[in-house]
């Protein structure tokens, strides 16, 4: 029996799709328009929209089209809807004036529970080639090596999206990737290590996972944070972690606020 697609409408305070998309952690989301996206995750895709409440413009609601099973067992966790962002946001604002603006501008950001392998590749690529080039590479890898889906969705007719490929799939289609500079050779070595040598990437580079969806926040994530902290906040990373973040449960969220602020600088008023 085919599962029934339902429309789920929920109020989620301190959750903003556009801010999450602009934070650099989900370059493979498909943006339909402001506050409306298609989210590919493994072998599923979700059409999701965020709307202001008609009677209270301080409140937003999420509208999702999916099966009941997928809502509770896939997307609720993927979007990190259990997290109390209001409490964490208030704690981060109390860190001091230099964090108040990033916390206000990114107060709807959640850290997504992404596919481990995809999150690992994304985080590594960001450290190698930066956010913009990493986003291009991630979509190219998925389109060349992943499984293609054409899915009918209300209001958008048919949409094409791609599953993120496994290491085996990347090795099979690696020759089709074309010239991607140092990304090509690194990606091939990584996949060979995983397939042939059982490289446990989920247990290495712990700081990468704290940033991109692994939610292991015992230590502040240091991926690219050294330069960002020194350049924009005048802080040493180790001192920042020890001194500022002792009471913050989701330390990765602090970094996402900073990254979102840096990637989306406010326009200067002339």
What is each residue range found by the language model?
Residues 1-270:
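HhH-family (HhH-GPD) DNA N-glycosylase catalytic core used in base-excision repair
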């Amino acid at each position: 029996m085919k599962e029934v697609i339902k429309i789920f409408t929920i109020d989620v305070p301190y959750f903003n799709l556009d801010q999450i998309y602009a934070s650099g952690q989900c370059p493979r989301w498909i943006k339909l328009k402001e506050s409306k996206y298609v989210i590919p995750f493994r072998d599923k895709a979700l059409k999701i929209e965020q709307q202001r409440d008609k009677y209270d413009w301080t409140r937003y609601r999420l509208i999702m089209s999916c099966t009941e099973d997928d809502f509770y067992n896939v997307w609720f966790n993927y979007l990190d809807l259990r997290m109390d962002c209001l409490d964490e946001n208030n704690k981060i604002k109390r860190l001091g004036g230099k964090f108040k603006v990033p916390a206000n501008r990114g107060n709807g950001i959640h850290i997504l529970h992404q596919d481990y392998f995809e999150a690992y590749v994304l985080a590594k690529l960001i450290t190698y080639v930066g956010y913009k080039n990493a986003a291009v590479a991630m979509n190219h890898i998925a389109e060349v090596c992943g499984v293609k889906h054409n899915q009918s969705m209300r209001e958008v007719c048919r949409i094409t999206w791609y599953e993120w490929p496994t290491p085996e799939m990347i090795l099979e289609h690696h020759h089709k990737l074309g010239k991607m500079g140092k990304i090509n050779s690194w990606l091939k070595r990584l996949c060979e290590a995983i397939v042939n040598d059982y490289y446990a990437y989920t247990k290495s580079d712990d700081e990468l996972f704290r940033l991109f969806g692994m939610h292991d926040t015992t230590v502040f994530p240091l991926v690219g944070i050294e330069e960002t902290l020194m350049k924009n906040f005048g802080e040493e990373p180790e001192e920042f972690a020890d001194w500022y973040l002792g009471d913050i449960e989701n330390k990765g969220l602090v970094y996402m606020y900073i990254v979102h602020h840096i990637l989306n600088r406010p326009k200067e008023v002339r």
